[in-house]
Swiss-Prot record:
Disulfide bonds: none annotated. It is found in: Cytoplasm. It comes from Thermodesulfovibrio yellowstonii (strain ATCC 51303 / DSM 11347 / YP87). This is Serine--tRNA ligase. GO terms for cellular component: cytoplasm. The gene is serS. Belongs to the class-II aminoacyl-tRNA synthetase family. Type-1 seryl-tRNA synthetase subfamily.
Length: 424
């Protein structure tokens, strides 16, 4: 959520920033609500001043033992004034609720370093690591490799649950588990605290990280009692410190979390229908940071390097891309996408998204900290990134390490977890 004081003081500046993101916001509605809010506040202040003055007069008259008729008349007037005041205060609450709702639909403001652009075609490549894999045979897609090896079963998963689901079997299931354990081990060795959170969360948690109210159509919801299945561990892990005031000495806090994730993929009709790239249920290892504001952009670079390290150790070619203003996520001030090379598709595909939200999520979730030698509190900055998406990493291994005979070489760092060198 944006700072309401900034929104009130800088509507034109905000409109310009959001135009860069491709958001068309009706600020006239907001300004109209603000004008009405200010009028109601003045009226409330005036009536409260009258009430205080008359209350003092009544007390004074009682002290002087004045006639009851005068006192009763003033009391009756105050009763009527109280009813009017209650009605105006109710109107003010309704206006403030509308203002709050308006703020909940406003995206974050892009950082000055974010490249300008309309969509993903104008994202900017920052760096590459490794050379795209080349073969002396026609490389297969991961779904063909998985079915030939008998380690992925899409057909039976479809029978059980429908499209966009998969069953991992045998060495496929073991590879998935090996990747989870490898990533958790790697990140905890770097100082991240492992967290295993609930995968069902309440509405307040979803609102705190920015999924609600704007993206409800992409969430799986349980109606009674009301819960949401998490689309990413970002949601429960960020909400660990919701409504808390941390000390400066506690920061930075680094968490790593493995969870299943669930997404409707409502806007993805016809995209990646085959394979593991876009599933309703998938596993992911997530990195989440709580940091001081002045450190957050250095922490974003560090977070991105931590995600990159996974791919380097697995020997998977990748590139890092800075998202342009038009492709930036709703809550993000700046994002790097890490894209891994997939020979079966002949292109790079996103495997991690590393973002700095500045204080956007912290305002929504009310996560603050207190400096050692300073009064008051400040909002922390939150960051997160995939470290990595397990299914897409498995896809990259199958496609980059495939052999002419249909087997797949196991990356060296995974062999202690797998107990084998080759999947046949």
């Amino acid at each position: 959520m944006l700072d309401i004081k900034f929104v009130r003081a800088n509507p034109e500046k905000l409109k310009e920033a959001l135009d860069k993101r491709g958001y068309q916001i009706d600020f006239e509605e907001f300004l109209s609500l603000e004008r009405e809010r200010l009028l109601l506040l003045r009226e409330i202040e005036q009536k409260r001043a009258i009430r205080n003055s008359v209350s003092q007069e009544i007390a004074h008259l009682k002290k002087l033992k004045s006639d009851n008729e005068t006192i009763d008349k003033l009391i009756a007037e105050m009763r009527k004034l109280g009813e009017e005041l209650g009605s105006i205060e109710q109107k003010l609450r309704e206006i403030e609720d509308k203002v709050q709702n308006f703020l909940l639909f406003l995206p974050n403001i892009p950082h000055d370093s974010v490249p300008l652009g309309k969509d993903e075609n104008e994202n900017v490549e920052i760096r590459r690591w490794g050379e795209p894999s080349h073969f002396d045979f026609e490389p297969m897609n991961h779904w063909d490799i998985g079915e030939i090896l008998g380690i992925i079963d899409f057909e039976r998963a479809s029978k059980i649950a429908g499209s966009r689901f998969a069953i991992m079997k045998g060495m496929g299931a073991r590879l998935e588990r090996a990747l989870i354990n490898f990533m958790l081990d790697l990140h905890t060795q770097k100082g991240y605290i492992e967290v295993l959170p609930p995968i069902l969360v309440n509405k307040v948690s979803m609102t705190g990280t920015g999924q609600l109210p704007k993206f409800e159509e992409d969430l799986f919801k349980i109606v009674d009692p009301e819960f949401y299945l998490i689309p990413t561990a970002e949601v429960p892990v960020t909400n660990i410190h919701r409504e808390e005031i941390l000390s400066e000495d506690e920061l930075p806090i680094y968490y790593v979390s493995y969870t299943p994730c669930f997404r409707k993929e409502a806007g993805s009709h016809g995209k990646d229908v085959r394979g593991l790239i876009r599933q309703h249920q998938f596993n992911k290892v997530e990195l989440v940071k709580f940091v001081k504001p002045e450190d957050s952009y250095e922490e974003l670079e560090s977070l991105t390097r931590d995600a990159e390290e996974v791919l380097k150790m697995l020997g998977l070619p990748y590139r890092v891309v800075a998202l342009c203003t038009g492709d930036l996520g709703f809550a993000s001030a700046k994002t790097y996408d890490i894209e891994v090379w997939l020979p079966g598709q002949g292109r790079y595909r996103e495997i991690s998204s590393c973002s700095n939200f500045e204080d956007f999520q912290a305002r929504r979730a009310n996560i603050r900290f207190r400096r050692r030698d300073k009064k008051g509190t400040e909002f922390v900055h939150t960051l997160n990134g995939s470290g990595l998406a397990i299914g897409r990493t498995l896809v990259a291994i199958l496609e980059n390490y495939q052999q002419k005979d249909g087997s797949v070489i196991v990356p060296e760092v995974l062999r202690p977890y797998m107990g084998i060198d080759v999947i046949r």
